[in-house]
Amino acid sequence: MPTAKFVVADPKTGRCYQIEADNTPLVGKKIGEVFDGKIIGLEGYKLQIRGGTDSSGFPMRPDIHGSRKVRVLLSAPPGFKPKRKGERRRKTVRGNTIAPDIVQINVKVVEYGEKSIPELLGLEGGENQEQ
């Protein structure tokens, strides 16, 4: 049972939450696809896959099909940040499909549930609690 860290971005609040969960139900899904948040414990939420990283630290790229590692000539992010105008460099990146060896998956909330994310994760009453 491969586990992954899900980094859940909440566009309303601008906060991110880390959740460790099984990524087996998402194997085969691609960047941009929407899935039910129930898979990672966010009941009622719809989440969109935005990217990720494999166990070696190579980033996923939406324009490379499949789940393989490839060395490609890049001129823009993700996977390469040019220092000078027009700079290109050959870098190793992953494809846009989730595989069992993906250890971090970045997701964004596209549809909200009834309860807030901190409430579902048991974080409610931590830093904003009045004394």
Swiss-Prot record:
SMART domains: Ribosomal_S6e. Keywords: Ribonucleoprotein, Ribosomal protein. It comes from the Archaea. It holds the Pfam family Ribosomal_S6e. Residues 81-93 have a biased composition (Basic residues). The keyword Ribonucleoprotein applies. GO terms for cellular component: ribonucleoprotein complex; ribosome. GO terms for biological process: translation. NCBIfam families: PRK04290.1-3. Belongs to the eukaryotic ribosomal protein eS6 family. This is Small ribosomal subunit protein eS6. The gene is rps6e.
